[in-house]
A protein has these predicted regions:
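Residue-level signal for cytosolic alpha-helical hairpin/rod architecture
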Residues: 81-82, 100, 111, 123, ...
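Buried hydrophobic core positions in alpha-solenoid tandem helical repeats
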Residues: 83-85, 125-127, 166-168, 186, ...
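Intrinsically disordered, low-complexity regulatory regions
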Residues: 1-86, 91-92, 100-104, 430-431, ...
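Alpha-helical solenoid repeats of the armadillo/HEAT superfamily
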Residues: 91-105, 133-149, 160-161, 173-191, ...
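C-terminal per-repeat helix/turn "cap" of leucine-rich repeat
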Residues: 116, 122, 129, 157, ...
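Internal amphipathic alpha-helical repeat/solenoid segments
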Residues: 75-98, 106-136
C-alpha cells in the first residue's frame, strides 16, 4: 500500500507504534500487579471478614453467657443483666430467640425481679420483640411480658411504653403459644384498676369475649379470668353486655359446661358478678341458665360446686328469678346437697341464703318447708365441716322460717332436735348465739304444743342467762 511517505518517515512511524504497544503492555501488566496486590492485602478484606466474625462471635458469646446464667441457682445481680438488653436488640434472629428464652426462664424461676428488668431498661426491647415476625421470639417475649405484668410497677411500665396494642394483636395470633402468652399478659394487666381501664379503652373486652370460644383451654381460662376481673367494676358492664345478641353471656354459659373444671368454675364466677345487674339477670333467666347450674351444683368437684352455689344464691336475691328457680327443681337439688356427705361451710352458707330468698315469696314458703330442706339444715348443724359461723347462719335461717305463722306447724316433728340446739346456743358465751336462741324460742312459743316439749334443763338455762344479763345491767348502772 502506497502511503506517499519516504522510507525514512515510514520507519519512524513504525518505530512509534512499536513503542506505544510496549507501553500499553507494560501498563496493563503493572495494573494487574497492582490490583492483585491490593486484593491480597488484609486492609481491604477487613470489613467483610470482620462483619462475618462479629455475627459468629456474638452468637457464640451469647449462647455461652446465657447457658452459664441459666445454670446459676441464686438470684442474679443486676450487673449480670446488662448484656441482655444488647442481645435483645441484636439483629441476629438466633440471638434474639436464645436471649428471650433465657430471660423468660430467669423470670419464671424468680432469679431476676421485675424491678431489675425495669432498671436495666429491658421493657421496651421486650415490647419491640413482640412485634417480631418470628413466632419463637413472639412466644418467648410474650411470656416475659406476662411474667412482668404480675408486678404493679411493671404493669405501669408496659402501659407507658405502648405494650397493650401489640398484646391485643398477638392475642389474635394463629400460633397457639403466641396467643396463649399474650392473653396471659392481658390477664395480669387486669390485676390493677388503672391498667384495666387502659385495656378497656384500647378495645380489650371484645377480644377477650371472642377468646372464650377458643379451642385452647388455657386461653379460655385466661380470657374468662380477665373478664371476671373487669366485671368487678360495674362501669365496664355496658361494654361487656353491649356485644350483640347476648354474645358474652351465651359464651359464658357454654363455658360453664366445659369439661375443664377451672374453666367452668371461672365462668360461674364471672356470671355471678355480672348477675348483680337486673337486666343481666333477665337475660340469664331467658337463656335458661338454671338448667346447667343444677348439674354444676351437684358436681363432685368442691370448687366447682361452691362457685355454682354462689351463682345460685346471687340469682335468688332477685324477685324475678325465684319462681323460675323453684319451677326447675332447684329446691330438690338443694335438698340433695344438704343431705349429702360432700359439703363445705361455703356451700351451706349460700344454701341458707338461697332458702331464705326463695321462702320470702308467700307461694314458695310451703315448697321450701315441704321439701326435706329443713331436715337437711338440721343435719348440717351437726356436720363435721360446720364452723361456728356456719352454725349461726343455719340457725338464722331456721329463725327466719319459723317467723312464718303458717309454717310453724311443719316444724313439730323436729321440735326435740331444735330444742337441743337452742340449749347449746344458750350455753354459748357469745351474746349473738344467746340472742338468736331466745328469738327462736319466742317464735316457737306461738305454737301452744311447743310448751309441752320444753325441757326443765332449757328453762334452767334461760334463768341462768337472765341472771347473767341482770348482773351485767346492774354493773353498767354503776359506771
Amino acid at each position: 500500500m502506497d502511503t506517499g511517505l519516504c522510507k525514512k518517515c515510514a520507519q519512524l512511524l513504525k518505530n512509534l507504534v512499536a513503542s506505544l504497544n510496549q507501553l500499553a503492555a507494560g501498563f496493563v501488566k503493572k495494573m494487574k500487579e497492582c490490583m492483585t496486590a491490593l486484593s491480597n492485602c488484609s486492609c481491604l478484606r477487613k470489613n467483610k471478614s470482620s462483619a462475618t466474625y462479629s455475627v459468629q462471635q456474638e452468637r457464640q458469646a451469647a449462647c455461652a453467657l446465657l447457658d452459664h446464667l441459666d445454670t446459676v441457682e441464686s438470684p442474679l445481680h443486676v450487673a449480670l443483666l446488662e448484656p441482655y438488653r444488647t442481645l435483645l436488640l441484636s439483629s441476629d434472629l438466633e440471638v434474639q430467640r436464645k436471649t428471650s428464652l433465657s430471660l423468660a426462664n430467669l423470670l419464671f424461676k424468680n432469679k431476676v425481679s421485675a424491678e431489675q428488668i425495669i432498671e436495666t431498661g429491658m421493657v421496651l426491647p421486650l415490647l419491640e420483640r413482640l412485634q417480631s415476625w418470628d413466632p419463637t421470639v413472639q412466644r418467648n417475649s410474650g411470656q416475659c411480658v406476662a411474667l412482668l405484668a404480675s408486678s404493679d410497677s411493671s404493669r405501669e411500665a408496659i402501659l407507658s411504653m405502648g405494650g397493650v396494642i401489640p398484646l391485643l394483636v398477638l392475642a389474635k395470633s394463629y400460633d397457639p403459644l403466641v396467643q396463649q402468652n399474650a392473653v396471659w399478659a392481658l390477664l395480669n394487666l387486669t390485676l390493677s384498676e388503672g391498667t384495666m381501664k387502659v385495656l378497656c379503652r384500647e378495645g380489650a373486652i371484645p377480644v377477650l369475649a371472642l377468646l372464650l370460644q377458643s379451642s385452647n383451654y388455657k386461653v379460655q381460662f385466661y380470657s374468662c379470668s380477665a373478664l371476671s376481673n373487669i366485671a368487678m367494676f360495674p362501669e365496664h358492664h355496658p361494654k361487656m353486655l353491649g356485644i350483640g345478641d347476648s354474645f358474652l353471656l351465651k359464651s359464658l354459659l357454654t363455658l360453664m359446661s366445659s369439661s375443664v373444671e377451672k374453666n367452668a368454675t371461672q365462668a360461674c364466677r364471672c356470671l355471678r358478678i355480672l348477675s348483680g345487674n337486673v337486666g343481666t339477670l333477665e337475660q340469664l333467666m331467658h337463656l335458661d341458665c338454671a338448667l346447667p347450674l343444677k348439674k354444676l351444683i351437684c358436681s363432685p368437684s368442691l370448687p366447682l360446686a361452691e362457685a355454682a352455689i354462689r351463682l345460685l344464691s346471687e340469682l335468688s336475691t332477685h324477685e324475678l328469678s325465684r319462681t323460675s328457680l323453684v319451677n326447675v327443681g332447684m329446691l330438690h337439688v338443694i335438698e340433695q346437697l344438704l343431705l349429702g356427705d360432700k359439703s363445705s361451710p361455703i356451700i351451706i352458707e349460700h344454701i341458707v341464703v338461697t332458702i331464705i330468698n326463695l321462702s320470702s315469696a308467700c307461694e314458695e314458703q310451703q315448697a321450701v318447708m315441704y321439701r326435706k330442706c329443713l331436715t337437711g339444715l338440721l343435719q348440717a348443724l351437726v356436720s363435721s365441716v360446720t364452723s361456728e359461723e356456719t352454725v349461726l347462719c343455719i340457725t338464722s335461717c331456721l329463725h327466719h322460717l319459723i317467723s312464718y305463722d303458717n309454717v310453724i306447724k311443719l316444724l313439730k316433728p323436729h321440735y326435740a332436735t331444735i330444742l337441743e340446739y337452742i340449749l347449746l346456743y344458750l350455753k354459748n358465751q357469745e351474746v349473738r348465739f344467746q340472742q338468736l336462741a331466745i328469738e327462736t324460742l319466742c317464735n316457737l312459743k306461738k305454737d301452744q304444743d311447743f310448751s309441752v316439749v320444753m325441757s326443765s334443763s332449757l328453762e334452767e338455762q334461760l334463768k341462768m342467762v337472765h341472771a347473767q344479763t341482770e348482773r351485767t345491767r346492774l354493773l353498767l348502772q354503776k359506771i
